[in-house]
């Protein structure tokens, strides 16, 4: 018989510490007035580089896949939390983005509801698809974020 070494400490003690998450900027208010929307679109147009987007749907509470919040981030323009329900469409936001590359996670989930409000990418980078192409074992946003920042 061989002996199995006894484990010391609980799994929590053996796991590496989780990174401390901090917002880069203060949490912005939700954009739900025309004046705030126009001002954010102007800032977004002056930004540079790709644009990160995310749509929040209320599919657990509603029968539609409509976007109820659109989150936007671009270097030089900050974060925008746009309430698409407050506006007829988000065509001005689409024009402010122009031909900048979009960065989404699980793009197939968000593209239909973003198109419904007038947002259409000309170039797209999907972080979930990138994780699959890299043959990563987990491609959820949290797992990808952890694997790319903990290294």
What label would you give each PLM region?
Residues 48-53, 57-64, 81, 87-88:
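An N-terminal domain-cap segment
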Residues 1-51, 55:
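N-terminal accessory regions of nucleic-acid-interacting proteins
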Residues 40-46, 59-64, 71-72:
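Short secondary-structure boundary/capping segments within folded domains
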Residues 18-30, 68-151:
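Active-site-proximal helix-loop-helix substrate-binding element of RNase H-like nuclease domains
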């Amino acid at each position: 018989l061989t002996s199995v070494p006894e484990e010391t400490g609980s799994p929590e003690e053996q796991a590496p510490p989780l990174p401390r998450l901090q917002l880069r900027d203060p949490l912005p208010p939700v954009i739900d007035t025309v004046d705030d929307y126009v001002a954010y679109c102007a800032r977004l147009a002056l930004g540079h580089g790709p644009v990160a987007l995310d749509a929040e749907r209320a599919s657990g509470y509603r029968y539609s896949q409509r976007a109820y919040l659109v989150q936007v981030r671009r270097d030089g323009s900050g974060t925008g939390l746009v309430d698409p329900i407050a506006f007829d469409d988000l065509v001005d936001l689409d024009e402010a983005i122009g031909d900048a590359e979009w960065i989404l996670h699980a793009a197939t989930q968000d593209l239909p509801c973003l198109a419904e409000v007038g947002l259409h990418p000309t170039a797209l980078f999907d972080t979930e698809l990138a994780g699959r192409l890299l043959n990563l074992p987990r491609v959820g946003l949290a797992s990808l974020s952890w694997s790319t920042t903990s290294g």
